[in-house]
């Protein structure tokens, strides 16, 4: 499940261990108020995927360092980490689609880390990323540059890389990784996934049947905090001041 996997091999000798079996967790819906901040915490060793407050979530860590994944109200999640190995997690949907994702929050890595829309497909088996922000390492730099796509107020460089006999959602397999990496970093805005899918197809980068699609925080040998929420159409209500993101489940 990890993006640093192939591309960080160009920068280090680290080999990530990904795609291990998950235990399921169906978290109860929690009514959150400003005065009653109830959180469900997942510790560094608790690799899992499931649903929480109407959203799909996935969390994986190799167990290194100190890292805590916290699922909050509605679509919100947060991660705090210090001197970690490798981890990736977030909230979103299952299956993935060409939806327009609105997200926001804060993301402040010290070292290698990034914030991305992250997902998988099967037939073909593809791991994909739309990277919105990153720390000290550009995760696309170890791949083959295919071109660019301009969408959602920015330009993204498109890369492809290959993982050979590496762990995946279907065990040890050989598969490709698709990347769109935003040239001007940001934390917050709209990501029109269909525009990336269309651009990838033009470069011969075809997807299969979608598995999950999350807005993920990932880190590798780094530290930092991340506090993110994800939404789709309901974001417009927040923009008009009718509700806040804490009140909305989309």
Curated annotation (Swiss-Prot):
Task: Provide this UniProt record's keywords sorted from A to Z.
Answer: Carbohydrate metabolism, Glycoprotein, Glycosidase, Hydrolase, Polysaccharide degradation, Secreted, Signal, Xylan degradation
GO MF annotation terms: endo-1,4-beta-xylanase activity
Q: Which Gene Ontology BP terms does the record give? A: xylan catabolic process
Coiled-coil intervals, chain numbering: none
Location comes to:
Secreted
Its EC number is 3.2.1.8
Q: What's its job? A: Endo-1,4-beta-xylanase involved in the hydrolysis of xylan, a major structural heterogeneous polysaccharide found in plant biomass representing the second most abundant polysaccharide in the biosphere, after cellulose. The most favorable substrate is beechwood xylan.
Name of this chain's protein: Endo-1,4-beta-xylanase G
Species assigned in the record:
Verticillium dahliae
By which gene is this protein encoded? xynG
